[in-house]
A protein has these predicted regions:
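C-terminal lobe/tail of nucleotide-utilizing enzymes
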Residues: 75-163
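Flexible, glycine- and charge-enriched loops at secondary-structure boundaries
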Residues: 2-9, 56-60, 139
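Charged catalytic carboxylate motif
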Residues: 11, 65, 145-148
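Conserved catalytic-core segment of NTP-binding enzymes
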Residues: 20-21, 25-115
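Bulky hydrophobic/aromatic packing residues
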Residues: 10-11, 25, 31, 152
Length: 163
């Protein structure tokens, strides 16, 4: 009974459980903020978390903080959370990106996805047109990068589901 739920996280989980069997995956996309109740509730209700991280110091700090929260939560026996990953976005060929990538590899290990999303004007254009990048720029490097991310994500999810 939804009236007996004690928190918004429980409320979200209750409604997700009502439709969970109807879908292979339910994706909750939240804004990337440090102290968002929406983000906290989404993580609490999630089976898996993918953390996109822009290659800058502020985003790195936020991503590491979110990753840490998720790691702690995944160790709680009451948690549904089974997998966590981080994907680098807005990647360019600059020194700052290389430095960020190396720090992420060192801190995150296998949680860091191999697939990366490059910085591209096609992404802004896609957002403006309300069309997914994988359709609007499918032959461009950024479109192929999103396809590679999907394949890697699917592979990781399949492995986690087997266990």
């Amino acid at each position: 009974d939804p009236k007996k739920l004690s928190s918004m996280g429980d409320f979200l989980l209750y409604f997700l459980n009502q439709v969970r069997d109807d879908y292979d995956y339910i994706i909750i996309d939240t804004q990337p903020t440090r102290d968002s109740q929406i983000l906290s509730n989404a993580i609490a209700a999630a089976d898996y978390v993918l953390i996109p991280m822009q290659c800058d110091a502020f985003s790195e700090d936020s991503a590491f903080r979110t990753y840490s929260i998720c790691s702690k939560l995944s160790k709680d026996p009451a948690s549904r959370l089974k997998g966590i990953g981080v994907v680098l976005t807005m990647v360019d060929k600059g020194a700052a990106t290389r430095e960020t990538r190396e720090e992420c590899k060192s801190e995150l290990g296998s949680a860091l996805f191999e697939a990366e999303i490059p910085m591209a004007l096609a992404v802004k254009s896609s957002v403006r047109k309300c069309v997914p990048v994988c359709y609007s720029a499918r032959t461009q490097p950024v479109g192929r990068s999103y396809a590679a991310l999907y394949e890697e994500l699917k592979e990781r999810l399949d492995k986690l589901e087997e266990n």
